Amino acid sequence: FKYRKRIHSLFHFGEFARIYQSFKNFDKCFKSNSLGTQAVFKFCLDNKIKLIYSATSASLGNKGEDKNLSPYAFTKSKNLELLENLKKWFNFKYEVIYFFNVYGPRHIRSGEMATVIGIFEDQYINNKSLTIVQPGTQTRKFTHIQDTVKVCYEAWLKNKCAHYGISHKKSYSIYQVAK
């Protein structure tokens, strides 16, 4: 194995990633998603590194109108706008991947960053009633981690400056998931 001095690509998936918590931890969300991500963008731009960036399904709802519903969705949407401008201004290379409620082995089952699938799994394993935020009819799309990894790899191979959504075609209500 010979060490390469030039970095070809960078996967940036390390942002603050929860809607509700972004209201409670605005500073943390803003610092991570805006300031931190802009530093990553600049590093990639300065070093001619292709970026593979994780977007969020939270900014896609209601034909894009949901992008201002939370600090999380807002910061992620602004990062996408910046990427598009970097492409125009500097021919910046990237691929954007939209994640939809990823689940699978080792997902977070407790605490503020837990996923809905993880919370339900933890409650089920511990013989607790599943907590459903009423009315329970709100729908979500889900993606298994193996499918997520596969699409991330496939997007990395491309050079299209394109956006890729990863989700099952069908949406499920929280009530259906709990069943």
Predicted regions and their residues:
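N-terminal Rossmann-like NAD(P)+-binding domain of SDR-like oxidoreductases, especially those catalyzing
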Residues: 1-102, 124, 146, 156
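Generic alpha-helical secondary structure signal
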Residues: 9, 115-119, 176
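Short alpha-helical
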Residues: 17, 172-173
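Aromatic/hydrophobic pocket-lining residues that form π-stacking "cages" and hydrophobic walls in ligand
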Residues: 40, 83, 120, 151, ...
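Glycine-rich "substrate-gating" loop/helix at the edge of Rossmann-like oxidoreductase active sites
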Residues: 69-72, 100-114, 134-145, 168-170
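Alpha-helical substrate-binding/gating segment
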Residues: 102, 118-131, 142-165, 171
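PAPS/PAP-binding and catalytic site of the sulfotransferase fold
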Residues: 173-179
